[in-house]
Amino acid sequence: MSTPTGQPAYVLHSRAYRENSALVDFLTPQGRLRAVLRSAKGKAGSLARPFVPLEVEFRGRGELKNVGRMESAGVATWMTGEALFSGMYLNELLIRLLPAEDPHPAVFEHYAATLLALALGRPLEPLLRSFEWRLLDDLGYGFAMDADINGEPLAIDGMYRLQVDAGLERVYLLQPGLFQGAELLAMSEADWSVPGALSAAKRLMRQALAVHLGGRPLVSRELFRKP
């Protein structure tokens, strides 16, 4: 498919490709695009790094495109420490989950907003959980957070398990990995003041993402474990 010229983009990942070129994965409103960047060791190559808002002209109709023009479209988002690791985590999620050339403008907008919030030092966990949930929902993998798989409203004192690609199922026998109704209802309202809601949201998103990641671990998660 042909793509509009001069569209906004962010670099998700870049690696050397043949002599003096790079193979770059971009996030654009038109989806994830892969393109060859010529003269990657020149000025263009200095721009082809994560978290820099770009305007890129893509050429070619095949799945592997060429970068015709690339310019800065704003100030690079500067992050360090766990905020930087979080940005790398978002990039890896998008590379792994977002189909090539499948337009998701809402994902692009939320990604840009999340980078800005990370750079401003906002609390990491709520930002990451929100991004994970919105990404799943936009890709069609979302599920109701205030009702079970039978359409019944969640009970505050109920216990639930996630049936991936179906939703939340109420259970009446204790077992590992369950979620409290109060925690789930807090998640649905993004009310992180409820005790246990954030840690439960992390467990829930990991379960929801796992099936779509194909059993391969995310490399960026290991960064958070290093001293």
From Swiss-Prot:
A biological process from GO: DNA recombination
A cellular-component GO term for this protein: bacterial nucleoid
Keywords in alphabetical order: DNA damage, DNA recombination, DNA repair
One Pfam family, short name: RecO_N
Ligase found in the keyword field: no
Highest taxon of source: Bacteria
PANTHER family, per database record: DNA REPAIR PROTEIN RECO
Family statement drawn from the similarity comment of this UniProt entry: Belongs to the RecO family.
Listed name of the protein: DNA repair protein RecO
